[in-house]
Amino acid sequence: MMNKALRSTWQEFQYMISQINNKTNQIIIFKCIQNWYFDKKKLLSLHLIEEFGLEELVNIDIKNYPLEKSECTLEDIKRFLKIQPCSEECMIVWLRDILWELVVLSIDIKCEYCFKLEMSALFDADNEIVFLECNHCGWVKTVDGCSIESIKNIRLATNQDLKLAGLI
């Protein structure tokens, strides 16, 4: 259950998003969410912020990531925000998921395991390669199509990583 201050904070977030023009690009949307987050961060639980990796997404240097290639639209976010989170944890997860959709490049490639379209491009820091992860089942493969057993050190793929991999 969310306390009154958190419910009010979520309502402010919904209102802020509702005031953004539908033709606004993803970079401006990201900056609006980022500014709201920095303003409201003190109201959120640090352990939940850390647990769900919110800081990694909200603190990116936007010029290094493919936000302009994001398929996440303001309309998608507005539809998503019509639902009220039942807890602070849910609110932070939703915020993280919105930022993820804006920051991580989504590729329309069919997963060879579950056969769904849509994989996320991420970076294997140990092997220094971009890999694709299915957004539905989590199956991973290299950009060349080779299956990968496990990846331990994952980070967001930058524009440079994606260019070298031939994805942008």
Segments the model singles out, each with a brief description of its role:
Residues 1-36:
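Short terminal alpha-helical segments
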Residues 43-84:
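Short, charged early-sequence alpha-helical segments and their helix-coil boundaries
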Residues 111-114, 134:
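Short cysteine-rich clusters marking metal-coordination/redox-active sites
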Residues 115-119, 138-141:
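Cys/His-rich microdomains that often coordinate metals
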Residues 122-131:
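Short linker/helix segments within small regulatory modules
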Residues 137-155, 162:
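Short metal-binding segments enriched for Cys and/or His
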